[in-house]
C-alpha cells in the first residue's frame, strides 16, 4: 500500500490532478473522554507520512511539556490545538484534519468526549459519511459512548467503525473484545446502522491502525485504515435528488444572469428541467458556468453558476431542484432537535430557523417528547434542556422549501438561532412536513444584511458559531 507520494516524483500538475480525482471520505471520531480519539488521529497522520520532520520535532518537544504518555510521544497533541485542551488533556473544540492515501482522501473530525461538549460533537457529525466510535477496552461502553452512537444515528450516519482501543492494556483479550462488541450490537440494534465493523487496536502503539498488529493472533480482518479506504463513500441513504440553494444572483452585466451556489445533492446537466422554489417557476438549464469554464455536468459539492433558459425571478434563499423531484413548500415542520443552548426550550419560544440559505422566523408550537440517551427510547416532555434530544413542532412565518431529513440530509436539516444573541441554539432534522395550502410568496431576502445570522457556510458554519470558530 503506497501511503505518501511526493509531488516532485511525477510533477505537481499530475500530483494535484491525482488528489482532485480521488474519492473523499468524511468521518468523525467520537466516544468517551480519554478513549484515545485524538491519539488515533495523530497516529493516522504520523503513520501515513502526513507530517514533516519539523512537526515531528515540535511534537517531541510538546510531548515533554504537555504530553500524557510519560516520556513517550503523545500523538494526540497533533490534533489538540487549544491551550485549554493541552492543559487538561482533553478535546474541547472540533478539530478537522486532512490526509490521503493512494486510494482515497480523508477529512476527519476529532470531536469532544466530555458530555458538556457533546453539542460540539454534533458539528463534526453533521457532514460525516461514517463514524469511528472509540471504546476504551478497560472500561467498555459508557453513557457517552451510547449517547454518541444515538446521535450519529439521528444525524443519518449509517456506517460505524467500532474501534476497541487500548487493547494492549487488557492483554489483547479476545473475550474482553467480544463482550464489548456484543454489548454495542445489542444497544445499536434499533439504530438502523447498515454496518458496524469492530476492530481491536492500540492507537498509542499503532497496532491495527494503519498496519496489521501482531499481538492479536485471533484477529484476521483488516486494520482500520484499510477499512476506511474500502468502505463505500456514498451509500444508498446519501443518494438524493438535485438541490442547489441560491447564495447570490450573478449579474456582472446586462447580458449575463445566473444563480450561484453550492450543489447540496445530486447532479444536473444542460437541458435538464428545473423548478425554482418557493416561486414554483420552471425552466431548463442553459449553461453550467464556473471560473474554469462551462461544465457538461455538475454534482454534489461543486460551486457553480446555473444559467437558466428563461428569465426566472429568484434571489438568495431560493432553491433550484430538478422538476422530476421538486421540493415541498411548508410553514409547519415536525423536527427532531439537538438542543444546545443553556436555557430550556419551551413552547412559544421565538427563534430564527435557517435551512440552507433560507432564514425565517420560527415559533415552537409544541414540545412533544425527549429521547433518552441511554436507551434511545422516547418519553413525553414539555421542554428541552441543554444537550437534550427531542421532537418539536415549529410554525414558520412563511413557507420554505424543504425535504424530509430521511430523503436529503442537506435540505432536510436546519439550525435554530437565538434572536437576541444570534447564538446557534439547536440542530434540527425535519421529520414530517405539514404542507400548507396558502399561496407561496415571492422569494425575498431573509433578513437585513446586518442582522442575518450565520450568513454563509450553511449548517456547519452555523453550528460552529456555538464555539466562536
UniProtKB/Swiss-Prot annotation:
From which source organism is this entry?
Methylorubrum extorquens (strain CM4 / NCIMB 13688)
General function of this protein: With CysD forms the ATP sulfurylase (ATPS) that catalyzes the adenylation of sulfate producing adenosine 5'-phosphosulfate (APS) and diphosphate, the first enzymatic step in sulfur assimilation pathway. APS synthesis involves the formation of a high-energy phosphoric-sulfuric acid anhydride bond driven by GTP hydrolysis by CysN coupled to ATP hydrolysis by CysD.
**Protein known as:** Sulfate adenylyltransferase subunit 1
Homology family: Belongs to the TRAFAC class translation factor GTPase superfamily. Classic translation factor GTPase family. CysN/NodQ subfamily.
Pathway, per Swiss-Prot/TrEMBL? Sulfur metabolism; hydrogen sulfide biosynthesis; sulfite from sulfate: step 1/3
Q: Region G1: list its residue ranges.
A: 31-38
Kindly list the cysteine pairs connected by disulfide bridges.
none
EC assignment: 2.7.7.4
Q: Which residues cross the membrane?
A: none
Amino acid at each position: 500500500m503506497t501511503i505518501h507520494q511526493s509531488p516532485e516524483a511525477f510533477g505537481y500538475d499530475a500530483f494535484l490532478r491525482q488528489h482532485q480525482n480521488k474519492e473523499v471520505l468524511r468521518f468523525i471520531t467520537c466516544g468517551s473522554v480519554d478513549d484515545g480519539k485524538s491519539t488515533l488521529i495523530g497516529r493516522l497522520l504520523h503513520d501515513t507520512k502526513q507530517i514533516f520532520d519539523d512537526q515531528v520535532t515540535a511534537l517531541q518537544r510538546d510531548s515533554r511539556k504537555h504530553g500524557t504518555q510519560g516520556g513517550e510521544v503523545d500523538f494526540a497533541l497533533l490534533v489538540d490545538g487549544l491551550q485549554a485542551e493541552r492543559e487538561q488533556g482533553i478535546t474541547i473544540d472540533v478539530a478537522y484534519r486532512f490526509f490521503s492515501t493512494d486510494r482515497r482522501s480523508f477529512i476527519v473530525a476529532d470531536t469532544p468526549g466530555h458530555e458538556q461538549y457533546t453539542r460540539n460533537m454534533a458539528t463534526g457529525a453533521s457532514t460525516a459519511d461514517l463514524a469511528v466510535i472509540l471504546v476504551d477496552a478497560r472500561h467498555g461502553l459508557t453513557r457517552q459512548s451510547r449517547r454518541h452512537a444515538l446521535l450519529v444515528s439521528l444525524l443519518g450516519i449509517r456506517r460505524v467503525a467500532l474501534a476497541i482501543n487500548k487493547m494492549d492494556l487488557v492483554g489483547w483479550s479476545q473475550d474482553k473484545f467480544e463482550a464489548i462488541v456484543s454489548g454495542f450490537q445489542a444497544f445499536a440494534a434499533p439504530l438502523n446502522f447498515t454496518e458496524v465493523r469492530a476492530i481491536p487496536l492500540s492507537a498509542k502503539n499503532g497496532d491495527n491502525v494503519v498496519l496489521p498488529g501482531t499481538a492479536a493472533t485471533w484477529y484476521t480482518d483488516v486494520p482500520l485504515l484499510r477499512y476506511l479506504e474500502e468502505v463505500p463513500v456514498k451509500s444508498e441513504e446519501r443518494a438524493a435528488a438535485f438541490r442547489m440553494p441560491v447564495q447570490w444572483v450573478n449579474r456582472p452585466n446586462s447580458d449575463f444572469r445566473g444563480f450561484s451556489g453550492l450543489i447540496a445533492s445530486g447532479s444536473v446537466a444542460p437541458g435538464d428541467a428545473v423548478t425554482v422554489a418557493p416561486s414554483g417557476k420552471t425552466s431548463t438549464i442553459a449553461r453550467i458556468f464556473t471560473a474554469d469554464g462551462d461544465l457538461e455536468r455538475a454534482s454534489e459539492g461543486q460551486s457553480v453558476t446555473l444559467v437558466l433558459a428563461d428569465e426566472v425571478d429568484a434571489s438568495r434563499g431560493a432553491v433550484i431542484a430538478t422538476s422530476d423531484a421538486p421540493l415541498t413548500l411548508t410553514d409547519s415542520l415536525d423536527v427532531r432537535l439537538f438542543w444546545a443552548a443553556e436555557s430550556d426550550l419551551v413552547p412559544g419560544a421565538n427563534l430564527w430557523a435557517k435551512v440552507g440559505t433560507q432564514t425565517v422566523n420560527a415559533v415552537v408550537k409544541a414540545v412533544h417528547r425527549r429521547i433518552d440517551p441511554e436507551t434511545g427510547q422516547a418519553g413525553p416532555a414539555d421542554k428541552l434542556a441543554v444537550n437534550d434530544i427531542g421532537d418539536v413542532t415549529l410554525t414558520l412565518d412563511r413557507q420554505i422549501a424543504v425535504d424530509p431529513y430521511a430523503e436529503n440530509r442537506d435540505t432536510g436539516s436546519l439550525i435554530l438561532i437565538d434572536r437576541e444573541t444570534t447564538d446557534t441554539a439547536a440542530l434540527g432534522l425535519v421529520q414530517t412536513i405539514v404542507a400548507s395550502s396558502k399561496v407561496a410568496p415571492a422569494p425575498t431576502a431573509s433578513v437585513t444584511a446586518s442582522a442575518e445570522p450565520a450568513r454563509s457556510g450553511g449548517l456547519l458554519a452555523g453550528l460552529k458559531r456555538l464555539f466562536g470558530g
